[in-house]
Amino acid sequence: MVIYYDMQFLKLHITAVYMVDIAKISTCYNLKDNIKNLQYYRYIYYCVCGMENKNMSDINERICIAGAGPAGLTAAMYLEKKGYKNITVYEKSDRVGGKCYSPEYKGKRYEMGAMMGCPTYYTIKEVMDYIGMGHPAGPALDREFRDEKTGEVFNPVGKLESLSVLKQTKKFYKLLDKKYPGAAKNGHKGTSTELGEDFASLCDRFKTPKIKKLIINPYTSFGYGYMDEVPAAYVVKYLDKDTLTKFVTKDDLWCWKNGTQHIWELLSEKLNSNIKLNSEIKQVVRADGTVKVTTADGTEEYDKIIVTAPLEFMPEYFDATDKEKEYFSKIISNDYKVFVFTVKKYPKISAYLQGNMCRERAGHMMVYYHRWPGEEDQVITAYVLGDPERGITVDDCRKHVYEDMKMCGYEVDKMVNEQSWYYLPHLKPEDYKSGWYDEVESWQGKNNTYYAGEVMSFGDMEETAEYSKNLIERFF
């Protein structure tokens, strides 16, 4: 955001863009002799621009946040930066970070959830700056590709084909910008419902099917679903042109030595907010202009609540409206599993098995991650999309991991840990096309309730954090 030090320029700019009364600017300006910090600038900017934001006289409001993952803690951070002082964050588990989960094995942390980022993770960079964390100092990321049937190393995009893949990728983003300007922006408010069609169909419509060869690795193997099932909007918001380029070229990929969870541990330590772990919300009642939140420790009263926990479960403990029940029942999720193990012989590099990144091969390993190259006394993590509807159980997935690792030449020695994630809450194409997002966005602030978290943006930590940042900018 630009900070205007020249008052005349500020008046001219806002007058030209928003056609507001100069007197209003002058009145606001008298609150401070000069604009030297961001809080006063924002106060003036939002007063005269008539945006959704509340003014700073509300900083004593009691704010409750449900969930201490990236979405919840980022919301708390930006509230505190705006001057809010009475913030309570409830987290039902015994740790912060949500799907940023970095346990320890023999003195080093490994990843069971989010593992990487890149320079386009601007909000995460703001969080890191806030907590005094420098550039991520984790191990370098690299990978090879293996055949899903033989385990042999191969190149899924040959030299001759690479030119056509690059050409179609450029064409795809050019058409996207032309037909759906702003499609890659964070959140779904105002996004064309035409982008509710599945991503594979959009590629066919654009006559750019080969871009899927680049998208599939950082999308499907990371648990976000299949190209022919997921609404295209989710793909293009997560993998905008710049982010995809970073992932494909491996240009300055971020990996954190102490894990992604450490980001949120440090943030929770710095925040003045009251962060309550092991505090599952049992009931929320919104009445008489207040929000009453009940846990095992009793009932507390708040002025506002921000829900970053999964919205489809919200009606189980909220006094949910009929519309909340109807709309949140449409949210679906993926069954994403992570297996952690040692091996008898260690690989030198991580690997994708692209042939397993389809519904027909659900339960098979899509990628294994060798986090600490050259250090054999560490764990390998393998990632699998399950399929409970087809009867593929966690035991089936574990069995396939043993088989697939052996096929690749790295027999599993000992299973150390495993996690089944409720992953990427999202909508089916038909529900996205129905205008679900614009309807839910119209509820923001009603009943003193605000909705955030993965489903309102996307399932990676940058998108969820950026949405929380924008939510605070819009309404607080």
Predicted feature descriptions by range:
Residues 80-104:
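Glycine-rich FAD pyrophosphate-binding loop
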Residues 5-15, 41-44, 48-51:
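N-terminal amphipathic/hydrophobic targeting modules at extreme N-termini
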Residues 82, 283-394:
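Mid-domain catalytic core of redox enzymes
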Residues 99, 107-139:
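Conserved FAD-binding subdomain of flavin-dependent enzymes
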Residues 241-287:
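Helical element adjacent to the flavin cofactor pocket in flavoenzyme catalytic cores
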